[in-house]
């Protein structure tokens, strides 16, 4: 094979290979890193038991979004150290297989309905999102 035709063959083979790679395979970090979405809800009236029960009802509905792998709904623990924040009403932590699954959650009708139906209850929401390997060590 002549150098010129060999070079063209290799260029075309390289282009064919690139064209066959899916966009998801080209972004392995997005698919392999566990995504954690941690939200702290602060009620407008933190002493209102009805509002607290209503928000808990909404969080339990929200847990039904199918891309969520695991959910934890928590209240502040009875721990007292200077670095601990305990002024929130509920902690909502959910785990996703990857960022793509979390992006689906963000636009899912259950999530959008949750915001529409329950956002009047809170005065503030703080969100911490993180990614990392599924298992370390």
What is the predicted role of each segment?
Residues 1-17:
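N-terminal secretory signal peptides and thylakoid transit peptides that target proteins
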Residues 18-24:
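Hydrophobic h-region of N-terminal signal peptides that target proteins for export
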Residues 24-29, 60-89, 120, 127-132:
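Short, glycine- and small/hydrophobic-rich beta-strand elements in well-ordered beta-sheets
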Residues 24-50:
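C-terminal segment of N-terminal export signals and the immediately downstream linker at the start
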Residues 33-43, 74, 79-106:
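Short, well-ordered beta-strand segments in beta-rich or mixed alpha/beta enzyme
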Residues 47-73, 107-121:
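Short amphipathic alpha-helical segments
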Residues 94-133:
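Surface-exposed, polar helix/loop patches in the mature regions of secreted/periplasmic/lumenal proteins
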Residues 136-137:
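Short, solvent-exposed mixed-charge patches
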């Amino acid at each position: 094979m002549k150098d010129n035709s060999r070079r063209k063959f290799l260029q075309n083979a390289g282009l064919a290979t690139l064209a066959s790679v899916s966009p998801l395979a080209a972004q392995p970090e997005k698919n392999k890193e566990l995504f954690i979405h941690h939200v702290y809800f602060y009620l407008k009236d933190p002493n209102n038991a009805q509002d607290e029960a209503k928000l808990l009802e909404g969080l339990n509905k929200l847990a039904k979004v199918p891309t969520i792998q695991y959910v934890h709904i928590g209240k502040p623990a009875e721990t007292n150290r200077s670095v601990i924040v305990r002024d929130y009403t509920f902690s909502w932590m959910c785990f996703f297989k990857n960022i793509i699954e979390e992006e689906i959650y963000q636009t899912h009708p259950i999530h959008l309905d949750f915001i529409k139906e329950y956002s009047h209850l809170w005065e503030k929401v703080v969100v911490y999102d993180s990614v990392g390997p599924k298992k370390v060590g």
